[in-house]
Structure formats: structure tokens, C-alpha cells
Amino acid sequence: MQAKHLTFTVAAALAFGLGGTAADADVFTLKSATFEDGQIMPKKVANSGANTGNNPNCVGENVSPQFSWTNVPDGTKSFVMLMADPEGRGGAGVVHWVAYGIPASVTGFVEGEVAKPSDKYVGGRGTRGVGFYSGPCTPPGTMPHHYTFVLVATDFDPQELPPGLTRDEVTEKIAPGGKAPVHAKGAAGMVGLFVNPWKR
């Protein structure tokens, strides 16, 4: 995988204090039973088109992946989850999911759980304007897009941030003025690839 495709994940992980590798003991780690880090995600995670104006590039079922995390940093009160496609919209990027206020007691999401509003998180606002998981609509005939998932452990109380925040607004809350991430305790990330060889 080329390094340029990991820009958002790496930048977020470094900025929010991710260190080491998933193989290291006691490292904050994000995993999925739906796909392996750096591998192709299944068709079902792609958007169905229901929240995209019936975009013909949306060929899936909008089933959100399963996620779990371990070795949560000390002092964590809630988590932020961000999903983005840096290659979407011709390189302008697409933010697919912004979720925060995930209580520290939550250790993961089952498959399909966050493709709708849930009391396990506060919904932000992605590029498509929805506050829940909105899967890939990768154009056919392109190289695989790299969908980044970043989980940030924070010291925010679960209800501290209002609903409807964008990714940029959330990251500004975590690291005011683009300076030190004063509200982050650590971060973990994954990359899932998606390629569209299907027709609706």
C-alpha cells in the first residue's frame, strides 16, 4: 500500500497520540471481523444508495462493519470514530461517518449496528449530511479507494459535544487551534479498501 493513501489515518493517529503497532502488547488497537486492515472490504458494506440520491455507484447494502477495540488509554471518558475516503470526489475527499460521545464502557459495534442512529454514539455530519454510517460509493473503473477508520480516545464526557458536528469541528475540539491534542488520550486506526466491479 502506498504511503500517500494513508495521509488522513497517519496524520490523525500521530496527532492524537497513536504509537507502536497492533502487534505490540498493551497498545490501543482497533480491529474488525468484517475486514482485515489494508484489505478489500466486502460488497455489503458499500452504500445502498438510499441516502445518496440513488447514486448508481452505490452497489451494496450499507451494512456497517463490525469493530472492536482493546487496551483503552487511561483517563478515557468517550471515543470519537471518523471514517473518510481521501480519494473520493476526485481527490477532494468524502467524510463517510462522524461519531462521538461513544461511552468508555463501549468496546465495539456489531455488524450493521451503526448504519442508523444509536444511543451508543452522538451523530455528527459527514459529507452526505447524515449522522450515521454511510458506506462507500466507489466509482467503477477506478483503483481501490482507501477508507480510513480512526478511533480517538478522549477525555470528553459522552454528552459534552453537541450533535451535528463535522469532522473538522470535532478535530478542532480535540486539538484547539491545530495545536497539541489536549483532549486526546490516544488513537487507533484501520484502512479498508473498496473497488467497484459491480453494476446495480
Specify the residue positions occupied by each region the protein language model found.
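Intrinsic disorder/low-complexity detector
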Residues: 7, 21-22
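Bacterial N-terminal signal peptides
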Residues: 9-17
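Bacterial N-terminal signal peptides that target proteins for export
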Residues: 1-9
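N-terminus-centered regions that define maturation/targeting leaders and the start
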Residues: 22-200
